Amino acid sequence: MSTPKAPGLAVLPVSKSEGGASVRTLQPSGWPTPKGYANGMAADGRIVVTGGVIGWDSKGHLANGFLAQVRQTLVNIAVILAEGGARPEHLVRLTWYVIDMDEYLASLKELGMIYREIFGAHYPAMALVQVVRLVEKAARVEIEATAVVPR
């Protein structure tokens, strides 16, 4: 399977009631609504989990630069999810590992645009962790994803 390039990857249509869709955003009463993520998710179904995914293409070439790596990483996650029968709206958790928190924070607008281009406006629970480095020395971001496909 080859990895699609982001511009050709349309946001997959959201399935309204696939098997009694049972993914629900958890928003405690009185808490401010988060922007770009959820406080928590509740789901019932078959779990699809990725490993740590980085921004290399189907030929093993790492994208150049932080935003390009994020884009390719999210595309790669979409491909892995599809392979497991999952769609973007099935995502319940993303854990981001970055080597430069300042670079991430300076790119929030662009990151949001890239995210929505690939996954639409579905925002699962997310965590962001700064690390000293990643296994692939030139990688600037690595993301793990968990999805739950309704039964």
Model-derived features: positions:
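N-terminal presequence-like segments and the immediate start of the first folded domain
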Residues: 1-92, 98-151
